[in-house]
Design a protein with these regions (language model features):
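The feature marks the first
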Residues: 2-44
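Short helix-capping and inter-helix turn/linker motifs at the boundaries of alpha-helical repeat units
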Residues: 2-6, 56-57, 99-100, 132-134
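Primarily EF-hand calcium-binding motifs
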Residues: 8-23, 52-74, 102-116, 138-156, ...
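Amphipathic regulatory helices of Ca2+-sensor modules
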Residues: 26-46, 78-92, 119-133, 156-169
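Conserved GNAT-fold acetyl-CoA-binding loop/helix
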Residues: 45-53
Length: 183
């Protein structure tokens, strides 16, 4: 058996964020459920403008993935299809990341910034991470690993860079690898 690459292990973690019911598949409802968990964690109604924006962005991510990678046309993705889709749509196609995935990530980060100061404090970061399903005992470590300047906060821009590294970078030196805990 070959060892999984860093990017594959990160995509496994991301697949787990979505497959919370343990079916081994991701469906559109799973992606929308993640959006609803994020909204709930930050106290934002799904019916608000920001809530609708986030859910719409998550819906766009789903559309790109399922269109590109649902090989058997069953409207769900198994782990292999998900890995292929993430790699094709957002790693190999940087414009795809910028056009489709970045807006969804940005919407999450801006919603998590509940006081609107342009950065996430440890508590805001924790709420976002718990919504994603990051193990609670790894959240403080993730925050510290991303807080490279020791300021006690993470700017939305820093988090956007970390997310890009997490979802697209094979470089094991990137701090964004730890965005969702230990890989």
């Amino acid at each position: 058996m070959t060892e999984k690459t860093l990017l594959s292990r990160k995509h496994d973690r991301a697949f787990g964020h979505l497959d919370r019911n343990g079916t081994g598949f991701i469906e559109r409802e799973d992606i929308i459920d993640l959006g609803e968990r994020v909204l709930s964690a930050v106290g934002e109604p799904t019916s608000s403008e920001r809530g609708a924006e986030l859910l719409g962005a998550f819906g766009e991510v789903w559309t790109v993935l399922v269109t590109a990678c649902d090989r058997n046309a069953d409207d769900k993705l198994d782990a292999r299809e998900y890995h292929i889709g993430m790699t094709w749509a957002f790693v190999q196609d940087e414009e795809g990341y910028d056009r489709i995935f970045h807006p969804a990530v940005k919407a999450v980060m801006e919603l998590a910034d509940t006081d609107g100061d342009g950065s996430l404090q440890a508590g805001e970061f924790r709420a976002m991470q718990l919504a994603f399903g990051t193990p609670a005992d790894e959240i403080d470590e993730a925050f510290a690993g991303l807080d490279r300047d020791g300021s006690g906060s993470l700017t939305v821009d820093e988090l956007l860079r970390a997310a890009r590294q997490f979802y697209t970078s094979p470089d094991d030196r990137d701090p964004g690898n730890g965005l969702f805990g230990r890989i």
